[in-house]
Amino acid sequence: MFRTLLFAILIGYPSLAGCFGQTLTTVMNNGDSSNRVDMIFVGDGYQASEIVSTYRDHVDETLSAFFNPGIAPFPRYQNFFNAHRVNVISNESGADDPINNIFVDTALDATYNTNGIDRLLYFNTTKANTAVNSALSGSGIDIDMRLGSVNSEKYGGGGGQWAVWAAGNTVALDIAIHEVGHSFAKLADEYYTSGQSWGGGEPNQVNVTSDPSLGKWDRWLGYDDPDSDIGVIDYYEGARYHEFGLYRPSDNSMMRSLNRPFDAISRERFIEEIYLEVDPLDSWLDDSSTYSADDTLWVNSVDASVINVEWYVDGKSLGLLGESVSIDSLSLAAGTYSVQAKSL
């Protein structure tokens, strides 16, 4: 995402002179909610005694996993995120497990075997949204990324409006990251069932295609990922549950197997979604005013290590990068000029 600001300056001549009894805990704050991706965690199957122990630990562990250096693109963009924990108390711990005839009393009705798939763990999204909206009421916090932590050890998860996972499972952190690929970046699964053939149209997800000639990710063709297991970006047959007729961009990324990085196409999609929520500049000098030689023009970026700011006068680059520029240092002749700050 690019942001361009236009300042007017006047160089004078010498003669002129901002439900469930749930509570909210902010666990990571990198800036105003209006210009950050707000990660909202909600838990199910946690009793009151587990909220500040098990649930807290599950959320903290998940956050640490997201911003682990091996899970690009999140570490580079950490300052673009805030994170908040909605504390919802259940009467009993765990989740329903119909196949094993286990039923527990939880606030959000988390259950395995959703849609008849044993490992598909999900909860009542209406109840989850009601709890979260109540906890956030009056806080000014947006809901940009929805994350559902379920207090269960059995493998399972699901990605829809909410990314939901069994937080007590041994691979819980990978499940969480994979499901966020669905819920936030709208990515498709890249694994498949042997023998299945695709007979539908072109999928709308960016990481699967039914027709390589459409060139869905041609701009990345030949890119050799630093992770050798991901390999070179190409069109690999087998994706979205079908062995034939659908193609994925890489041999083996996070959307195909757990404990893998995201490939370039998925990383790019995450970054695009981040910039839909975050303006690269947090604040700037009033750009509706006119300034003189004694003034300094400035902007504040979300993260100067990620965002470069280039300055222009009347459309011509000054070759200057930085968050401020002194007008006097530009050595402009007397007159009126337009100065632009462009985030890169």
Regions found by a protein language model. Give the residues of each.
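Secretory targeting signatures
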Residues: 1-18
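Propeptide-to-catalytic entry region of secreted or membrane-anchored zinc metalloproteases
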Residues: 19-135
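Active-site-proximal beta-strand/loop segments in catalytic clefts of secreted hydrolases
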Residues: 42-46, 86-89, 148-153, 186-188, ...
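Short pre-active-site segment immediately N-terminal to the catalytic Zn-binding motif
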Residues: 50-56, 156-177
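Catalytic zinc-binding patch centered on the HExxH motif and its immediate surroundings
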Residues: 94-97, 128-166
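Active-site recognition of the HExxH zinc-binding catalytic motif
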Residues: 173-190
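Surface-exposed, short loops/turns at beta-strand junctions within beta-sandwich domains
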Residues: 329-336
